[in-house]
Swiss-Prot record:
This is Probable arabinan endo-1,5-alpha-L-arabinosidase B. Endo-1,5-alpha-L-arabinanase involved in degradation of pectin. Its preferred substrate is linear 1,5-alpha-L-arabinan. Belongs to the glycosyl hydrolase 43 family. One of its GO terms (biological process) is arabinan catabolic process. It holds the Pfam family Glyco_hydro_43. It comes from Aspergillus fumigatus (strain CBS 144.89 / FGSC A1163 / CEA10) (Neosartorya fumigata). The lineage of its organism: Eukaryota, Fungi, Dikarya, Ascomycota, Pezizomycotina. The gene is abnB. One of its GO terms (cellular component) is extracellular region.
């Protein structure tokens, strides 16, 4: 089945330097980076090339409303940027929250990995609070009648793991409640996907308000992505909420989309950040974008070899190539022209272990079939 996917690429904040300074005027193209041998070379036609704009961002969520594009990303109180087109010019216009998250755990000032959806004349921004490397985490939600800054109400806790109410119930006893993603079908049923490392990616149904889990989570939860054999060693952290006794499984950042007649579950696999060019992970261990599909939003999702994503499957859609290193943190924006897969990546060469701004890129003319 042919799927039209335009690549809307966001160079991640994490660990990327030698990033050219881009003009913020109109849609002027960026300077080309220095030609440097890639640590994991790919054939030139292995993946579509990228195209940069002026947006500096990390972990984006993109929606399109009445001719304006809105981007939501990690940052103080969840940053909002707006633009008249995906090319830009992008302008930071404010934040979702007008104060720290009301959830009393994790990084309340700068919630992680937000995702914004529109349903029943309301905008919902789902976000996570946590501390890096630990699963004492929570997912919250804010709502507004408009997508821009101002007018948002923080409803607080939706689900949590590690500590707090409900964290002693399955699947929160073994999962990490970050990287929220919500899908609402044409029938109005909503589903929350979440998870990072530990027991992989899970899904629970939401009630009609999208503000609470529907039914009993123990019986309704579905494990969507997992691998039995952990590819990374176990942590020796003294806090049991910050170690994985059976080893680490680098699975996170899920996103569910629909392209008739299939539901596609996208996720990121591998090391996302804190790279050292003198000691890069083995080829294939850095971030890449993977996918599976199902005839049901509840799964099971399989790759084109028929492997269940809950048993180690996952079709690689985009990986390191050219000056792209460790792409991930993806989402899908459905436009009249087709489905736009957007994500962030590190621009190679990656040369130091600090966080810096990075840049939005877009390719709106790439058509490829990742399932054949």
């Amino acid at each position: 089945m042919t799927v039209l996917v335009a690549l809307f690429c966001l160079v991640t904040w994490t660990l990327c330097t030698r990033i050219p300074q881009y003009s913020t005027q109109g849609t002027q193209q960026p300077q080309q980076p220095e030609k440097t041998p890639h640590p994991h070379p790919q054939p030139e036609d292995a993946f579509p090339p990228t195209h940069a704009t002026d947006l500096k961002i990390h972990d984006p969520s993109i929606i399109h409303v009445d001719g304006t594009y809105y981007s939501y990303s990690v940052g103080r109180h969840i940053r909002i940027h707006q633009a008249p087109s995906l090319d830009g010019p992008w302008e930071r216009t404010g934040a979702v929250l007008n104060a720290d998250s009301v959830i009393p755990k994790g990084d309340r000032k700068a919630p992680w990995a937000p995702q914004t959806v529109h349903h029943n004349d309301t905008y919902y921004c789902f976000y996570a609070v946590s501390n890096s490397g630990c699963r004492d985490s929570a997912i919250g939600v804010a709502t507004s009648k408009s997508p821009g800054p101002g007018g948002w109400t923080d409803h607080g806790l939706l689900v949590q793991s590690g500590t707090g109410k409900g964290s002693d119930e399955h699947p929160f006893t073994s999962s990490n409640t970050i990287d929220p993603s919500v899908f609402v079908g044409e029938d109005g049923h909503g589903y929350l996907m979440f998870g990072s490392f530990w027991s992989g990616i899970w899904q629970v149904p939401l009630d009609e308000s999208l503000l609470s889990v529907a039914g009993d989570t123990s019986s309704e939860a579905r494990q969507l992505v997992y691998m039995e054999k952990a590819p990374l060693p176990a942590s020796k952290h003294p806090n049991p909420l910050c170690r994985e006794p059976s080893g680490a499984r680098p699975i996170e950042g899920s996103f569910l989309s629909y392209h008739e007649p299939w539901y596609y579950l996208w996720f990121s696999y591998g090391k996302c950040c804190k790279f050292d060019t003198k000691n890069l992970p083995p080829p294939g261990r850095e971030y890449s974008i993977r996918v599976g599909r199902s005839k049901s939003p509840r799964g099971p999702f399989v790759d084109k070899q028929g492997r269940d994503l809950a048993n180690g499957g996952g079709e690689i859609v985009y990986a390191s190539n050219r000056d792209v290193y460790a792409p991930g943190g993806q989402g899908v924006l459905t436009e009249k022209s087709g489905d736009i897969l957007y994500y962030h990546y590190c621009r190679y060469p990656v040369i130091q272990e600090i966080e810096v701004d990075a840049d939005l890129t877009v390719n709106k003319s790439t058509s490829y079939d990742f399932w054949v």
